[in-house]
């Protein structure tokens, strides 16, 4: 499994071995739960800053691509920070990251209720299949009885003897 924060800054090379950039963002299809490709910073006088999953030749510590093109669709940065709202209208977190599998399917969103909350209680994991994307928010339809968490590191916990 990958998190977007682990994919950012991966170096991208063309098939001749020339470095063409680094991953800055991902292009997503929210309703199909897919990563469509990766976004790089735009170069001077060039609008090409995207490569699709199909254009990837090698994916590992670096990425080698066949070609780059222009992308105008939804990016993760467009929804990062959106409020996640439950069916009662209560804000239950803000989107911070995505969890993606090795086939580039988006499995879940990672959200947090705030800076201090994430250090004390951890982050929440929201399944994408239980959500609806709005213009400024995400409606989460999941059950409140089931909570998935990413627990904080043992900063304040006692060490086992």
Label each residue range with its predicted role.
Residues 1-161:
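Peripheral interaction segments used for macromolecular assembly
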């Amino acid at each position: 499994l990958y998190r977007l924060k682990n994919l950012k800054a991966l170096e991208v090379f063309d098939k001749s071995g020339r470095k063409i950039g680094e991953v800055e963002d991902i292009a997503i299809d929210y309703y199909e739960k897919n990563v469509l490709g990766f976004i790089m910073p735009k170069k001077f006088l060039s609008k090409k800053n995207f490569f699709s999953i199909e254009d990837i030749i090698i994916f590992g510590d670096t990425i080698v691509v066949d070609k780059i093109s222009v992308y105008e669709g939804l990016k993760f940065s467009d929804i990062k920070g959106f409020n996640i709202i439950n069916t009662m209208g209560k804000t239950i977190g803000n989107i911070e990251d995505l969890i993606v599998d090795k086939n580039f399917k988006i499995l879940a969103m990672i959200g947090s209720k705030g800076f201090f909350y994430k250090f004390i209680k951890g982050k929440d994991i929201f399944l994408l299949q239980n959500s609806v994307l709005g213009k400024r928010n995400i409606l989460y339809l999941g059950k409140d009885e089931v909570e998935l968490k990413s627990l904080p590191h043992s900063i304040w916990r006692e060490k086992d003897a």
